[in-house]
């Protein structure tokens, strides 16, 4: 009977390609993580600007109301 086992030889060429593929996967992983963090921070900044603007509008209206009340007194 013939022995039909498969042998993988770990030559210098194999390690070169393995390292290249591994580095590409790591760079892609960091790109995805960086994109997600940037999107989350962008969304948080948009929400913060909205709250800040609405607070400024309320404060401005409150100050206008107080100045109108003082003018009538």
Curated annotation (Swiss-Prot):
Protein modification: Four species of SH have been detected in infected cell cytoplasm: a 7.5 kDa non-glycosylated form (SH0), a 13-15 kDa form that contains one or two N-linked carbohydrate side chains of the high-mannose type (SHg), a 21-30 kDa polylactosaminoglycan-modified form of the protein (SHp), and the isoform generated by alternative translational initiation. Of these different forms, SH0 is by far the most abundant protein detected during virus infection. Tyrosine phosphorylated.
GO cellular component terms given for this protein: host cell endoplasmic reticulum membrane; host cell Golgi membrane; host cell plasma membrane; membrane; virion membrane
Function (record text): Viroporin that forms a homopentameric ion channel displaying low ion selectivity. May play a role in virus morphogenesis and pathogenicity at various stages of the viral life cycle. Accumulates at the membrane of the Golgi apparatus in infected cells and may facilitate virus release by modifying the secretory pathway. May enhance host membrane permeability and disrupt cellular ion homeostasis, which can be sensed as damage-associated molecular patterns/danger signals, triggering NLRP3 inflammasome activation and inflammatory immune response.
BP-aspect Gene Ontology terms: proton transmembrane transport
Transmembrane listed as a keyword: yes
Name of the gene encoding the protein in the UniProt record: SH
Chief subcellular location: virion
Transmembrane segments: 20-40
Glycosylation sites: 63
Effect of residue 60 to R: In strain: ATCC 51908
Result of altering residue 47 to F: In strain: ATCC 51908
Protein name per UniProt: Small hydrophobic protein
Virion surface domain ranges by topology: 41-73
